[in-house]
């Protein structure tokens, strides 16, 4: 599969029913049967795990509560401020100056602002953000965004600031998919497709959260593992030393070698193929992977898939599937998830 997400046929998602469950997997006894096909969603932080969970909820009619909308709305404001602050810092470090000199002062005030901003922006702050984002030099810097860490949804939310920064703003389905909301604790959703009930567990992917993973291992029928291949040049936020791709591959290796998952199928989602392909022209893969022999985008994608498969070790080929995807692309994920769920049900027969 190449880098383009177009050309996918419209998918007919089956009629479904859904509900939420807050019961941790660890509360089930080992001899108790489960009424759902149980799925565990794993991956490092910012790999796209939660986006996959949100796609499942939206595609399979798992409606959000008002409190969940409120929670996500708060993080959307937080995302916007973090993005503009990251851009201002990148501008300060770059060889580009603002086209409008007044924006230099605005940028400095954004950088100096230590508030987390989980709510609607003041009129003054919103105007600063809009002016900085509209600056021609800032747009030139944004075109070079692959050279620094920036949330993939930055342009989406900054371009929609007028709509978002209102008292009656309620996130749309697209907003929910584009927002980055870190997973806290164990989240799970129960949904029904084609008369089969599934339960999908999502656990935080930061190092401090991974100790909780083992509490969810019992009775799992399949694993979804998200790996953001675009992170080949980035460092982990926890230590700013460890390469994110190396960490994710090591994590995948650990999961594959876990004795409790010896016969559990792993569905590997190689996420952010669009960002990956965009980066290649600016940040050569060979700068970070000396074992990459070179080639075009398809060669680079094949190389990344081979790295992931190698991390699975001696796992039998029948016990894993690899998919290249863009987790924020709802149509692509609808087709992918439909294929995956059918494969899981086939294994259970």
Curated annotation (Swiss-Prot):
<keyword id="KW-0807">Transducer</keyword>
<dbReference type="GO" id="GO:0046872">
    <property type="term" value="F:metal ion binding"/>
</dbReference>
<keyword id="KW-0449">Lipoprotein</keyword>
<keyword id="KW-0460">Magnesium</keyword>
<feature type="binding site">
    <location>
        <position position="183"/>
    </location>
    <ligand>
        <name>Mg(2+)</name>
    </ligand>
</feature>
<feature type="binding site">
    <location>
        <begin position="271"/>
        <end position="274"/>
    </location>
    <ligand>
        <name>GTP</name>
    </ligand>
</feature>
<feature type="binding site">
    <location>
        <begin position="177"/>
        <end position="183"/>
    </location>
    <ligand>
        <name>GTP</name>
    </ligand>
</feature>
<feature type="region of interest" description="G3 motif">
    <location>
        <begin position="198"/>
        <end position="207"/>
    </location>
</feature>
<comment type="subunit">
    <text>G proteins are composed of 3 units; alpha, beta and gamma. The alpha chain contains the guanine nucleotide binding site.</text>
</comment>
<dbReference type="GO" id="GO:0005525">
    <property type="term" value="F:GTP binding"/>
</dbReference>
<keyword id="KW-0342">GTP-binding</keyword>
<keyword id="KW-0564">Palmitate</keyword>
<feature type="lipid moiety-binding region" description="N-myristoyl glycine">
    <location>
        <position position="2"/>
    </location>
</feature>
<keyword id="KW-0479">Metal-binding</keyword>
<feature type="region of interest" description="G2 motif">
    <location>
        <begin position="175"/>
        <end position="183"/>
    </location>
</feature>
<feature type="binding site">
    <location>
        <position position="327"/>
    </location>
    <ligand>
        <name>GTP</name>
    </ligand>
</feature>
<keyword id="KW-0547">Nucleotide-binding</keyword>
<dbReference type="GO" id="GO:0005737">
    <property type="term" value="C:cytoplasm"/>
</dbReference>
<keyword id="KW-0519">Myristate</keyword>
<dbReference type="GO" id="GO:0007188">
    <property type="term" value="P:adenylate cyclase-modulating G protein-coupled receptor signaling pathway"/>
</dbReference>
<feature type="region of interest" description="G4 motif">
    <location>
        <begin position="267"/>
        <end position="274"/>
    </location>
</feature>
<feature type="lipid moiety-binding region" description="S-palmitoyl cysteine">
    <location>
        <position position="3"/>
    </location>
</feature>
<feature type="domain" description="G-alpha">
    <location>
        <begin position="35"/>
        <end position="349"/>
    </location>
</feature>
<comment type="similarity">
    <text>Belongs to the G-alpha family.</text>
</comment>
<comment type="function">
    <text>Guanine nucleotide-binding proteins (G proteins) are involved as modulators or transducers in various transmembrane signaling systems.</text>
</comment>
<feature type="region of interest" description="G1 motif">
    <location>
        <begin position="38"/>
        <end position="51"/>
    </location>
</feature>
<dbReference type="GO" id="GO:0001664">
    <property type="term" value="F:G protein-coupled receptor binding"/>
</dbReference>
<dbReference type="GO" id="GO:0005834">
    <property type="term" value="C:heterotrimeric G-protein complex"/>
</dbReference>
<protein>
    <recommendedName>
        <fullName>Guanine nucleotide-binding protein alpha-13 subunit</fullName>
    </recommendedName>
</protein>
<feature type="region of interest" description="G5 motif">
    <location>
        <begin position="325"/>
        <end position="330"/>
    </location>
</feature>
<dbReference type="GO" id="GO:0031683">
    <property type="term" value="F:G-protein beta/gamma-subunit complex binding"/>
</dbReference>
<dbReference type="InterPro" id="IPR011025">
    <property type="entry name" value="GproteinA_insert"/>
</dbReference>
<dbReference type="Pfam" id="PF00503">
    <property type="entry name" value="G-alpha"/>
</dbReference>
<dbReference type="GO" id="GO:0003924">
    <property type="term" value="F:GTPase activity"/>
</dbReference>
<dbReference type="InterPro" id="IPR027417">
    <property type="entry name" value="P-loop_NTPase"/>
</dbReference>
<feature type="binding site">
    <location>
        <begin position="202"/>
        <end position="206"/>
    </location>
    <ligand>
        <name>GTP</name>
    </ligand>
</feature>
<feature type="binding site">
    <location>
        <begin position="43"/>
        <end position="50"/>
    </location>
    <ligand>
        <name>GTP</name>
    </ligand>
</feature>
<dbReference type="InterPro" id="IPR001019">
    <property type="entry name" value="Gprotein_alpha_su"/>
</dbReference>
């Amino acid at each position: 599969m190449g880098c383009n997400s177009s050309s996918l046929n419209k998918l007919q998602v089956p009629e479904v029913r859904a509900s939420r469950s807050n019961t941790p997997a660890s509360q089930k006894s080992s001899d108790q049967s489960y009424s759902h096909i149980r799925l565990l969603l794993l991956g490092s932080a910012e790999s796209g795990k939660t986006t996959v969970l949100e796609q499942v909820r939206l595609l399979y009619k798992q409606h959000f509560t008002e409190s969940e909308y409120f929670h996500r709305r708060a993080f959307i404001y937080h995302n916007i401020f973090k993005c503009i602050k990251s851009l201002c810092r990148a501008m300060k470090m770059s060889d580009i100056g603002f086209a409008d000199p007044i924006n230099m002062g605005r940028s400095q005030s954004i950088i100096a602002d230590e508030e987390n901003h989980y709510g609607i922006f003041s009129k003054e702050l919103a105007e600063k953000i809009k002016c900085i984002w509209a600056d021609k030099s800032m747009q030139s810097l944004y075109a070079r965004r692959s050279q620094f860490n920036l949330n993939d949804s930055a342009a989406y939310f900054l371009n929609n600031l007028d709509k978002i920064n209102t008292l009656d703003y309620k996130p749309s389905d697209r907003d929910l998919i584009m927002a980055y909301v870190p997973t806290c604790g164990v989240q799970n959703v129960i949904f029904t497709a084609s008369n089969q009930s599934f339960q999908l567990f999502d656990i935080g992917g930061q190092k401090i959260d991974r100790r909780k993973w083992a509490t969810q291992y019992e009775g799992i029928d399949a694993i979804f593992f998200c790996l953001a291949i675009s992170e080949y040049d980035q460092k982990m936020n926890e230590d700013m030393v460890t390469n994110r791709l190396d960490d994710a591959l090591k994590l995948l290796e650990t999961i594959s070698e876990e004795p409790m998952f010896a016969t559990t199928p792993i569905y590997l989602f190689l996420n952010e193929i669009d960002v990956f392909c965009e980066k290649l022209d600016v940040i050569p893969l060979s700068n970070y992977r000396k074992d990459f022999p070179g080639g075009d985008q398809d060669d680079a994608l094949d190389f990344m898939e081979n790295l992931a498969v190698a991390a699975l070790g001696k796992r039998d080929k029948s016990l894993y599937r690899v998919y290249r995807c863009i987790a924020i692309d709802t149509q692509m994920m609808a087709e992918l998830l439909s294929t995956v769920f059918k494969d899981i049900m086939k294994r259970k027969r």
